[in-house]
Amino acid sequence: MIPWLTDRPAFPPVERALTEPNGLLAAGGRLTPEWLLAAYRRGIFPWYSDGEPILWWSPDPRLVLQPAQIRITRSLRKVLRGRRFEVRFDTAFARVIEECAAPREPGGGTWITPEIRAAYLRMHELGYAHSVESWLDGRLVGGLYGMALGRAFFGESMFSRVSDASKVALAHLARFLEQRDFGVIDCQMTTPHLLSMGAHEIARREFCAGLERWTVEGPPPAKWSGTTAAEFDWN
């Protein structure tokens, strides 16, 4: 049994999360900035489907990627050097989250509900949520979005309509964060794709201990739209 949250973000300790399903901690509550910031600082994130209440998660172990340790294969480095894609930051956040929300298969569902989209658009307006976009011939063909809090980045979702488009976005994000001394990219759930890019699992207690440092340090929230791909050297 998990607790039902009501009018304030009083999350239970993450150690009380279920082991099956892994990380389910609480239900209910809201998706206001106050709730989201309180959750992320504690290593908690919302994830649920249409028709369900808001569900809050903190899985153990946690998949993370240190920005400096991203694994760039020879073929990906060739793509990056060739600058086939134009990479932009925070110029099409609403479109990125819309593309991420599109079902992966015909008739499939999505956890990026209209309520989730509205909540993260608000966080983007406040300078906390960001997008990294891969453009090809003027078309948005890949990208990702997530939350930055202090020196921690919490990845939410990515999409790709052209081969390597999301990998290029992730590579630029990692380099951008490394240059700004970010401590971690939280990948939340383990996937083969992220493992292949250099992500690894750590214990939840280690992750949450790091958040106590990372989320109170670093720059204040602000848009990243002034960043250009010309800042990055892939040689």
From Swiss-Prot:
Its EC number is 2.3.2.6. One of its GO terms (molecular function) is leucyl-tRNA--protein transferase activity. This is Leucyl/phenylalanyl-tRNA--protein transferase. The gene is aat. It is found in: Cytoplasm. It holds the Pfam family Leu_Phe_trans. Belongs to the L/F-transferase family. It catalyses: N-terminal L-lysyl-[protein] + L-leucyl-tRNA(Leu) = N-terminal L-leucyl-L-lysyl-[protein] + tRNA(Leu) + H(+); N-terminal L-arginyl-[protein] + L-leucyl-tRNA(Leu) = N-terminal L-leucyl-L-arginyl-[protein] + tRNA(Leu) + H(+); L-phenylalanyl-tRNA(Phe) + an N-terminal L-alpha-aminoacyl-[protein] = an N-terminal L-phenylalanyl-L-alpha-aminoacyl-[protein] + tRNA(Phe). It comes from Azoarcus sp. (strain BH72). HAMAP family: Leu_Phe_trans (MF_00688). Keywords: Acyltransferase, Cytoplasm, Transferase. Gene3D superfamilies: Leucyl/phenylalanyl-tRNA-protein transferase, C-terminal domain, Leucyl/phenylalanyl-tRNA-protein transferase, N-terminal domain.
